Structures are given as C-alpha cells and as structure tokens.
Amino acid sequence: MKLSELFNPDEFAARHLSFGDEAALLAAVGEKSMDDFVGNTVPQSIRMPSELDLPEALTEADALAKLKGIASKNMINKSYIGLGYYPTRVPNVILRNVLENPGWYTAYTPYQAEIAQGRLEALLNFQQVCIDLTGFPVAGASLLDEATAAAEAMAMAHRVGKVKSERFFVDARVYPQTLDVMKTRAKYFGFELVVGDFAQADEGEYFGALFQYVGKDGDVQDLQDVIGRLKAKGTIVAVSADIMSLVLLKSPAELGADIALGNTQRFGVPMGFGGPHAAYFAFKDEFKRSAPGRIIGVSKDASGKPALRMALSTREQHIRREKATSNICTAQALLANLAGMYAVYHGPEGVKRIANRIHALASAFADALVSDGINVVHKVFFDTVTVDFGNKEKADQVFAAALESGYNLRRVNDTQVAAAFHETSACEDLVDLYRAFTGKDTFAFADDVKGRLNAELLRQDDILQHPVFNRYHTEHEMLRYLKKLEDRDLAMNRSMISLGSCTMKLNATAEMLPITWAEFSDIHPYAPEAQTAGYRELLADMENSLKSITGFDAISFQPNSGAQGEYSGMLAIRRYQEAQGEAQRNICLIPKSAHGTNPATAAMLGLKVVVVDTDEHGNVNIDDLKAKAEQHRDALSAIMITYPSTHGVYEEGIRDICRIVHENGGQVYMDGANLNAQIGIMQPAEVGADVLHMNLHKTFCIPHGGGGPGMGPIGLKAHLAPFAPGHALTDTHSASADQTAVAAAAFGSASILPITWMYLTMMGKQGMEQATRWALLNANYVAKRLSEDYPILYTGKNGRVAHECIVDLRPLKAESGITETDIAKRLMDYGFHAPTVSFPVAGTLMIEPTESESKAELDRFIAALKQIKQEVLKVGRGEWPKEDNPLVNAPHTASDVTGEWAHPYSREEAVFPLPFVREHKFWPSVNRVDDVYGDRNLVCSCPPMENYED
C-alpha cells in the first residue's frame, strides 16, 4: 500500500459528480473520452488560453477546519449598534427544522403551486404577520432588504401618485444605508430627493415621502399629523418601521400612511454581517397591481378546495419586461419563512413579552443614566438610548470603555453615543453598560420599570389573532407543523429539479454547516473593521477565486440577487460613461431571447431598449446587431447578453458581438445566469465582456431557499471597477468613495458566502473544471435521449447543446390539444418538478439537469417524459378523451384515488404510471390550482383555520 494513495483530497468532487457514469454517458452521446466530447461541443474560438488558477481541492474535513480558522478571526462582541440590525434568538426548533433542513432550503420559487403548498402557507403566514403589524390589507412575500424596499416604495409612489412632481421627501431620521440606496435609484428615475425635518415635510410639493418609525437615533415621533397634512395634498406616504416596535406601537396604517416597509431580521434571523434578511412591504389594497415582488394569494384547486399560489404575476419582469413594476425575481423566501415561523412559535403574547422586555431594559438604562445626571437625548424611545456627553473626549472614553468590556456601541457624532437594546439583552448587560457610561461599578435597578412610550403612541388593536399564531407554542406541536408543511413540498431532497436557467445543483451538507456558526451569524454589518478580519479574509479568498474563474479585475459582492447584480453591472457602465462625459449614451441593445429582467433593469437605469433579432438557430443575428449598433453609435450605452445563450447554445459569434459593440462606443454586460457552462472552459472577460453578474445561488451552490436568498456579485474590468456600488458606512475596498450603494449592507448577504467558499475549496481547480464538463455531458445525454420523442429546438456545434436544452412541445399540442402546462403538471404524478415552462419560447420545456445528478436519476426523469409522450399520443388517437385523461386532470392527489372513480384511465395509471414511482411516491396535496380565480378574487391573508385541518 502507498500511504499517499490512501488520502483522497478529491473526495468531495466524487460526491458532487457521478464519475462511475462517465463511460455510459459518453457512449450514449457518441464519444470516447471527455476531452473529445468537450472539443466537439464547445467552440474552439471561445476556449480560455490557460488553466484555472485555483488551489488544489481539500477534503470536507480539511476545508471545514480551514474555514473555522478563518471564522475564528471574527470577534463576537455584544452588539448594541442598532441601525436596523439586532442580535436575536433563532428558536432551535426552527433552526434545525427549517434553516438546516434541505426540505426547505433546496426548494425552488413556488411557480408550481401544487407541489409547493407547504412553503406557500409559510409565506402566507409571513404576509399575515406583516398585515397585522402594519395594519394594511395586503403584504408581499418579502423584498431583498429594507433599503431596497424603501427604493421600491419611492418608485411605487411615483407610479400610483397623482401629484405632478419629481420631488420625493426623505425624513432625515432614516437609516443612512437606506438613504444611500435611495440616492442611487432616484438619480436614474429622475427624482429629486429632499432630506429634511420630518415635521416640515408638508412645506413642499412632493409626489411621495418616507418617514422612519423608529428614528435612526431611537426617537419615536407621532407622525399622524404630518402624514395627514401630506395626504391632504395628495402625497403618497411610506413609513419604514421597525418590525419589533410595531408589536407595541400604532400601525403605519393607523398613522395614515399608504405603504409600510422594513426589515424582519429581528424576528429570529441572525445579523450575519448584513444578511440575508427578508424585508417586508405592505400597502393599501388599491396599489396591489403596482407592487414589486411576489405576493402569495389564496385560490382554489380543480376540486374546489382552497389552494395557495403566487398571485398577480402579470406585474412581474418576466411578463412585462421593460414595463415591469420592478426587476426583482428572487427575494428572501427562506428568511421570510424563518420570520413568519418566529411569530407562529412565539404567538402574540410571546412577541409582546420580547418587545416589552427590550423596551423595559432600555428604559431602565435611561432612568439610571438620567439619575446620574447624564443627558439622554430622546425622552420617548423604543429600544435605543442616545446620550450626549457634550464633549468628544468623554464620548471617546465611554465608547472605548464599552469596547473593552466586549460591547459595540454606535457613535452618533463627536459627542453622542447610542446603545440599542435587543432580544438577547440581559440584566447583567445593564450593569456592564452602566459601568462603561458612568465609571461606577454598582447599578441597582428597580424591577418595576416605567416605559418611555406615551400612551397615545401605543396600539390598541390586537395582533396575530389568527389561529395559526395561537396553536403551535409547544415544541412538539411546532415540530409537527413544520414537518406537515415540508411534506407538501417537492424539493431536491426528493428528486432532481431540472429548471432551465436555474442551475438546481447539489447544496452539499458540508457547504451549509458554517452558515450557522456564531462567528459568521452573530456579526453586525457595521461592526468595527478590526472585529471582522475573518469576513475580510473570506471575501479576499473568494474575490481571488472568482477573478480567476471569470478573468475580471475586480469583484463587488454587494448585490443581493441576480437582478440586483444586473442593476449593479449596468449601473457601473452608466457611471463610467458619465465620468467620460458620455451621459448621452442611453441605448441598450437586448437580444429578443433575453430574460425579462434585462429590459426591466435597463429601464430602471433610464435606458431605452432596442431589441436585436435572433436567427433560426436562436443566436443573435449579427447583421441586425451590426446595423443597430451603427445606427445608434453616438448613443449606444451597452448590450446585455446571456452566454451561453438563453436558448442553451454556445454562440460562436460572441467575440464578434463584443467587438461590434465596442467599435460603436458601447460596453458589454454579460448576464451570468448560465455561468455553469463556462468555468474552466472560457472566461467572460477574455471573450470581451466588460462586466458580468454571477448567481452564487446557481453556479456556486447557494441553495434557492424556495425563492431566495440569492447573491449576484459582479465582476468588472479595471476601467469599471471604481464605479461599482459603494456604501455610506463601510469601506468596500473596491468602489471609489463617492459611489452610492445598491443594497443595505456593503457585502450583501455575506453570511451565506461560506457556502460558495466551501464549494470552491472542496472542488479545487480540477473539480471546478470537471463540474462544467459534467454539466455539459448530462445536458447532452438528456437531449440525446429525449430527441427520440421530442424535437430539441436549438443546437449548436455538431448538433450539441450547452448545459441545457429546449424541448419543443408545440407539435404534440397541435396534434392532441395537450398543453405544456398539462405536461408540467403531469410530471408531478411521476415525482418530478417541471422544467422551465414556456421560456424562452412559448410551448416548450427548458431542461437543465446540472452536473450533480446521477445517470440513474436522469434515466428516471427521461423515462417519465417518454411515458408522458405515450400518454399524449393516446389522447391524440382518441383512446382517452381530450377533456378527461391523466394529463388534463394532473396532478392527482391521494383523495382522488381513494374516492369515487369514473375516469377512462385506471387509478394505477393516474398515480403509479411507472414502477419506480411506487418506490418513492410524492403525493401533491392539492389538485391543479385555478390561477384565474386567484387573481380575480385576490386574498393575501391567512384563510380560516378549518382550511388548515388535514
């Protein structure tokens, strides 16, 4: 035995990829070796000139040990910084059974409602929490963060408002990170932001206004009068409200506002150096068709039973493109589920106890300071005590004393220091903080504390009265409720999810473990830089890896989603061109096949979209591109192009596309949705891209979470790097100091970056190259096998596809009347989530199997689609009626096959159509959901409790 051969640093790659299937897969596609296969699939013209510059792989154990060493360089102080981020306690039953459970975190956005009823109910619970606390009748299923939500509120106010003005008022008490993001958005919308005293907001003419409730320094103001005066003038009013304070305070709706927004992080979601967290967004009923993001609604299924679904999707970017209300796709579903379940578990009395405890501790601390002659700035506050020492030296001394005792305070200005209390604050903290503020060792506080909130500020209405918030307060009950919901959903712990353009690959357990380590989860985003050395090292490691993979000169990690990455990349181009004196460049070329986020993003940046034709092979029509680039050469800003194309093909003309745009004065933005087909084969920067967004939740193993979180960092060439997103409170070490932000936290959802770090570290140089090759091989295997039954719509070199393929169902539909939707729903009876339906071409399925699926799983999926083809043919031949067959009736529930049966097909054909289905049957919990009924009868709050009964 050779000892060296018994250590296996590549063990993880062998878990991520199915090396044992290689020969059979290659034989099926007519190749003898992987090198031959890649050579015959990928155009030589795009191949990268050198190998990836990445370290060799580490084992799972070694990678975890190395990451633990990095994490240990973060210093966990007790955080009293506030500014929208607070220590909290994640209930362990929720931590283990939701956050750490692949049944929840590996699911996709619930487009296929029949196999997503569990997380749809969880998101409906979240919406109900937001409805109860804000007082509005409608709330969304989360936005990316509070600052983004504020910017969306500003945009929505302009859409729905009647005041003919381009001016928007911002309360001077808003969080600085919120104002920073609003400045970015306002510039390209053409809005003028006016920041001022909240009490004087009605002295100008504004289309909208935003107030902070509670203020950034802790004060609670009665906003009712000023809101009333603004409303009398027709101004749309938004309130950014602390979610925990709303447990006690009057709701924004009662104050007279139109929109409420904020962060739900305090409801059991760790700070995580800035994210991810779910923002809430609630509003008046008349605004529902202008609202951004997802909304969960109650509808009914084909049998008339209540069923949940995503409602009003015609507002969204994939439908309305440049006319969409927002470019948001992925939001923060998993974090919204955590926050909603926090309210379910604690119930109304539990959250009131927590909110009152926070307020009582802050009040007791303020009382002690006042009795000691210290100037507490605000008499009325919820959780934050701001002190003015009158001189800088004393403020420095107190800040340093607290730091030495292990407490992070916030420095408000030269003479003021603030302490923000929170759920984990304890009585001993009062003693330590009192010592830091006064220099005295003893602190005696009374058990009976008088609060600092005036009676007229407190809410009188009841909250969280729905039975779901009053039933699951023991751990057994909560555990079983979570399991019941999980069992209604089909996630990747059950079967492959082959959604094209979504890259649903393995989210390995070793990758997920570190996100709940305290060294990552318990760090405030504005903690002193000396306390975040571990995060800085992690970011530097990842920047180096991503630069090697993509060929770019700089990386910005701030964007919180792919859509926000798009916005950030195009924003860098706009800023660069303005700095070059070319602000007139406002034309954006977008291929006809592009994802809807592309035109929506361009419109948000004030760009005019010019559509470029595609040819019969799905490629960009080079002649049309050249003509339009030359026509608009003096105004050409950029092209937004996806590579490989949205049609799943390597376009051989990509270098020509980039050259033509550059020759006509434009920049090249590459959409990185399909980056999984590039790593180790080509580099976007090397073929001519100037900026690229990367979906870490696709290519780099961050799970989709049932609709978020995501991360969309951007890679930039050197000339664009200074124009990446900056930040008002944190040095990003990339953007120039005067650049405003796109997200609330400087490094976006930093606490999920360890997932990608682990993936890169365990795969290493060779593993990352192999992953791309296997993604191509699996896709071509699926395409080859399915081509026997279905036309493959687009192929490239040698009849090959890239990492995904488009199956054309239109001929079958024409023959039989069976639709792509019928086939998608029928796949549920076989235990599979449908591929992407009718995108980028109506009447098709786009399939992306990814590299991490075994041949056995691919064969089951292929067998399902082949059997479905035979079922469709039966309908076409008249053996089954068009109005009564297993496709139009799909999916079938257990209730269907245990009740009366009058169908022309058997129960077995309905629910066990192939032998393998018996081994691992997934039962949809509802029949086909009625989308039209749901939109016409929109209900976005929790239905009566009897609907929850089994």
Swiss-Prot record:
Ribosomal protein is among the record's keywords: no
Alphabetized Pfam families for the sequence: GcvP2_C, GDC-P
MF-aspect GO terms: glycine binding; glycine dehydrogenase (decarboxylating) activity; pyridoxal phosphate binding
Cofactor requirement: pyridoxal 5'-phosphate
N6-(pyridoxal phosphate)lysine: residues bearing it: 698
GO cellular component, as recorded: cytosol; glycine cleavage complex
GO terms under biological process: glycine decarboxylation via glycine cleavage system
UniProt keyword list: Oxidoreductase, Pyridoxal phosphate
Chain's role: The glycine cleavage system catalyzes the degradation of glycine. The P protein binds the alpha-amino group of glycine through its pyridoxal phosphate cofactor; CO(2) is released and the remaining methylamine moiety is then transferred to the lipoamide cofactor of the H protein.
The protein's assembly and partners: The glycine cleavage system is composed of four proteins: P, T, L and H.
Family: Belongs to the GcvP family.
Name of the protein this chain belongs to: Glycine dehydrogenase (decarboxylating)
